[in-house]
Amino acid sequence: PPRDTAPTNFKILVPVMANDLSNAAAAGAAGDVVELRLDALSILDAPNVQNVLCAARAAIGQGVPLLATIRTKKEGGLADLTDAAYGELGTAICHSGLADLLDVEANTAPAAITLPRLRPPKRWSTP
């Protein structure tokens, strides 16, 4: 059955490329969630990712959820990472406390990431 898409349940996600945060504040004002595409960074390591997450959080404020995404080349993104490096970055993002959500690639993550479960997963209910 189709999901309830009434206006009260509908959310707008606005993507922002991490190599250009100039529009991050506008994205935070325009959407319900800001997706930060970290795979656009020229230096894709934990310290740089943390610095960019801090800058993005400062730009969009605390009231808007921040979704961190690292899309690998094999999934159509820009990041050329091994599964181990992908897992290390995902774990660093999770532990940083700077992102509210982490986009995990289904074809990469099971083999690469063991993220701590910070809270029980939400279960989708069907009508």
Predicted feature descriptions by range:
Residues 7-9, 71-73, 120:
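Generic N-terminal leader/processing signal
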Residues 1-23:
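N-terminal amphipathic alpha-helix/helix-capping segment at the start of soluble metabolic enzymes
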Residues 15-17, 33-44, 86, 90-127:
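Catalytic beta/alpha-barrel core
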Residues 24-27, 52, 112-115:
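A short acidic, amphipathic alpha-helical/loop segment
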Residues 47-98, 108-110:
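N-terminal active-site wall of soluble small-molecule enzyme domains
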Residues 8-12, 30-32, 62-66, 98-100:
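Short, well-ordered coil/turn segments that N-cap beta-strands
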Residues 21, 75, 126:
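Flexible, glycine-rich phosphate/dinucleotide-binding loops
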Residues 20-32:
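N-terminal segments that cap or nucleate solenoid repeat domains
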